[in-house]
Amino acid sequence: MSVGNRLRRWLTAGGAAAGLAIGGFAAAPATAAPCETGDFAQWLQTFKAEAMSLGVSPATAANLDGLTYDKKVIGLDRNQKHFKVPFEQFLKQRLNPGRVAKGAQMMKKHAALLKRIEERFGVPGEVLVAIWGLETDYGAVSGKMPVLRSLATLAYDCRRTDLFQTQLIDALRVIDRGDLTAAEMRGAWAGELGQTQFMASSYYQYAIDFDGDGHADLLNSVPDVLASTANYLKGYGWQRGAGWEEGEPNYQALKGWNKSDNYTRTIGVFAKKLAGGA
């Protein structure tokens, strides 16, 4: 999913409030600076103290030390292009023959894993592989920007303070839990992580260890990636055995993944192709 799509999903779903619920805490965020003014380093130390007051360990909070404001992130945030395209055009852009062919290969390669995941969560493999392909081309393009720096920059910014301060706290909690190190936390510019692009609060709530190594690793572990994606959909109301096309029960669960009807419908079309439909 593009960064713009992911942000639209959070914002149209009441992202800040949802993030606070997901993060499991309710506290006034550190004061945001007016746009383009203030002292980022000073704000960061205030935020660090607040993070520790919310239970983040001092060792993990120390990863905030020395972070610098990233003007590139703000530029990308300010210059997002929001426009609607007809569904058929969107579908053609996202669902090229190569992506579909590779998806079919992934269905075969991970058939046993996908069966185990469906047995546990009720989400068919074709839906998970469709999301995986659309998000990052099966892990090929998941982003290389340092997530803590990106989230700190956006949390300091005046426009979405509550949303991104929540995300930053939960990114630190993911580190505290032992799933990833700060150095491993690289993703898209708005903080999306892993092969299906979880925001930090979603990572904290829905990411699970499915390969048995003791860590929920959505960057490198395909079992963790696909099972966590299924767990996310289940958390948004996925019903075992129900349909996912528009008007069917699981369409709304897919919209919990992305509020865009074009994107949700594209997941459905892709999944149907992977299942052997037209």
Language-model features: locations:
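Bacterial N-terminal signal peptides that target proteins for export
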Residues: 2-18
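A ubiquitous short alpha-helical element
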Residues: 30-35, 97-101
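Short amphipathic alpha-helical/adjacent loop interface patches that line ligand
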Residues: 15, 48, 111
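Basic/polar N-terminal segments that are highly enriched at the extreme N-terminus
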Residues: 1-2, 6, 28-34
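Catalytic glycan-binding domains that act on GlcNAc-containing polysaccharides
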Residues: 56-278
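Short N-terminal segments immediately surrounding and downstream of signal-peptide cleavage
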Residues: 31-52
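Residues at the start of alpha-helices and the adjacent loop-to-helix junctions
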Residues: 8-9, 24, 43
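C-terminal segment of classical bacterial N-terminal signal peptides
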Residues: 20-29
